[in-house]
Amino acid sequence: MASVADRFDCYQKSVQTPDHEVVFFEQAYRDAYDSTPMDLREDFCGTFAICCDWVASKSKRTAIGVDLCSETLQWGRDNNLAKLKKSQQKRVRLIEQDVRKRNRPHVDVLAAQNFSFWIFKTREEVIEYFKIARSNLKSKGVMVMDMMGGGECYEEGLVDKRKIVKGKKGFKYHWEQMSFNPITADASFAISFKFADGSKLKRAFEYHWRFWTIPEVREMLAEAGFSESHIYWENDDDDRDDDGYSSWERQEKAPSDASWICYIVAVK
């Protein structure tokens, strides 16, 4: 099964919940400005599933997807964009370029999801990116990023396994923590997919990042000119929404869980 599997399809089914992201972006913008966001920019957009869900959620919403990988963008055109109505497709703009470039029109929400900005390994690189991201926002705009952490995230060789699809056509998702250097905070991770027949797409995706922390990122956002930043921490399982997704609230204190994910929202 691995020989005919589509790694991008497996990734989307395992990692992405674009409808949930749209709801959270609305919450983050509403908390900052008490109004509804209409225009989105998705940096490191990959297959730009979030862009597609964004324009489908309201009739006048627009989305810009920015990514360097032509293969990934084309997969998104064939498999995500093609599923939209023609009128919705017209409201998605794709730009194949480095995210560290300024573009118009400016947007209400700029998202850099799945820890993607961790590819920048120095403060100078991150601050430069944050400054450019800020300039791509309207006067009332927010930047949304997710973060992970906790002691387990530094354990080399740890593999988190989850069953994504059950049955004969099912598969499992493996998140592997390949290496971590405590001196430089360089970290490597990989995603593999294991199928019902025992075959495997080993390390279908690899990531070589700097493991940034929340305080570091908030300090760099301030240096880049953002007026404030907020941490959205996941509520208890009892507080999940009607679709079973986690709910999030602003917090300034959180438990030291073995592993956690949160959002950072920077307000222009």
Functional labels for PLM-detected ranges:
Residues 76-77:
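Conserved SAM-binding loop
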Residues 144-220:
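SAM-dependent methyltransferase
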Residues 84-99:
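Conserved SAM-binding strand-loop segment of SAM-dependent methyltransferases
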Residues 100-110:
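A short acidic, Gly/Pro-enriched loop at the edge of an enzyme's catalytic core
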Residues 125-139:
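A short glycine-rich, Lys/Arg-flanked "PGG" loop and its adjoining helix->strand segment in the class I
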Residues 47-60:
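Conserved SAM-binding loop of SAM-dependent methyltransferases across substrates and taxa
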Residues 36-46:
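Conserved class I S-adenosyl-L-methionine
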Residues 208-268:
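C-terminal lobe and adjacent flexible extensions of AdoMet/dcAdoMet transferase-like proteins
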